[in-house]
Amino acid sequence: MKALQTLMSGESLTQDQTREFFQRLIKGELNDIQVSAALIAMKMRGETPAELAGAAEAILSAAKPFLRSDTTVIDSCGTGGDGSNTINISTTAALVAASMGLAVAKHGNRSVSSRSGSADVLEALKLRVNLDPSDASTQLADNGFCFLFAPHYHPGIKHAMPVRQTLKTRTLFNLIGPLVNPARPDAQLLGVYSEEWVRPMAETLQRLGVKRAMVVHGSGLDELALHGPTRVIELRNGELNDYHVTPNDFGVPSAPLDELKGGDADFNARILEDILAGGGSPAQRHSVAMNVAALLYLSGQYNDMKAATAATMEHLDTGQPLLHLRRVQDAQETYHV
């Protein structure tokens, strides 16, 4: 196989070559040795934006179809794997943003390195994570929020699971999740587990034609950080802008990372509901508000992060986000089982 020969010689694949290789992988046409060799060859050299984009195109082309309206759809998603075991910041931010009128199609999975991934905490909130695509589409249209469970939409990925479980090391698949949202969001807040991936992931989104995005790494977190500076590469109108932000840019004080410490899914779900009800600690509220502000900014509703954060804090005080979550919970009772 030419693609494998190219990789084994230390060269990178083109976007087209990678797409063709992963199309074969998700059809089950490659054996475990071929899959393992390719993943390790790319990992040792470092996956390129062309390879990430090609793999994402292959996976998206085979995904279960998801019908969405012409409204601007946004996603708040991280790679996971930062090892911080914080509360579910991006999931909480997604629900708050939906209650403020954004259409958030959150793509996610179970835990990577923490005790509670996005799917885990949503299940603890009694939300069904494996909705039929038509029901998820209805949920997004009616309530501005839906969760798209990655294994449900990308069944072909199972062909790589034996290799991934055997290798027990990060590969391209640890980066690809935020790139293969079947709703094909117009804008994304994408967190990465290591700063080395900020630019490659931003360039990958650029290749995939995403309209607006912020790729972030916040002092060890795959989120905007409250405890230190956050590296950002912003994608807008096809151009990339590289900068750093601090909590001060959002008008909130810094706080130690341990003030965002999470637990298991039930523990994190209780904190999430507390924040949505207008409670939570100052650090929890500020962290969520910063991430919501970025979503409001990416959606075009605000051009100023401080104003967007202040608006989010005021909205949290009303308790409306929790009422919105209750509507999402109630609506799913009318969907297919």
From Swiss-Prot:
It is an enzyme of class 2 (transferase). Its EC number is 2.4.2.18. Catalyzes the transfer of the phosphoribosyl group of 5-phosphorylribose-1-pyrophosphate (PRPP) to anthranilate to yield N-(5'-phosphoribosyl)-anthranilate (PRA). The keyword Glycosyltransferase applies. Anthranilate 1 binds at G78, N109. GO terms for biological process: L-tryptophan biosynthetic process. Its cofactor is Mg(2+). Homodimer. Binds 2 magnesium ions per monomer. It comes from the Bacteria. Keywords: Amino-acid biosynthesis, Aromatic amino acid biosynthesis, Glycosyltransferase, Magnesium, Metal-binding, Transferase, Tryptophan biosynthesis. Belongs to the anthranilate phosphoribosyltransferase family. Mg(2+) 2 binds at D222, E223. 5-phospho-alpha-D-ribose 1-diphosphate binds at residues 78, 81-82, 86, 88-91, 106-114, 118. One of its GO terms (cellular component) is cytosol. Mg(2+) 1 binds at S90, E223. This is Anthranilate phosphoribosyltransferase. GO terms for molecular function: anthranilate phosphoribosyltransferase activity; magnesium ion binding. Anthranilate 2 binds at R164. It catalyses: N-(5-phospho-beta-D-ribosyl)anthranilate + diphosphate = 5-phospho-alpha-D-ribose 1-diphosphate + anthranilate. Pathway: Amino-acid biosynthesis; L-tryptophan biosynthesis; L-tryptophan from chorismate: step 2/5. The keyword Transferase applies. InterPro entries: Anthranilate_Pribosyl_Tfrase (IPR005940), Glycosyl_Trfase_fam3 (IPR000312), Glycosyl_Trfase_fam3_N_dom (IPR017459), Glycosyl_Trfase_fam3_N_dom_sf (IPR036320), Nuc_phospho_transferase (IPR035902). The lineage of its organism: Bacteria, Pseudomonadati, Pseudomonadota, Gammaproteobacteria, Alteromonadales. The gene is trpD.
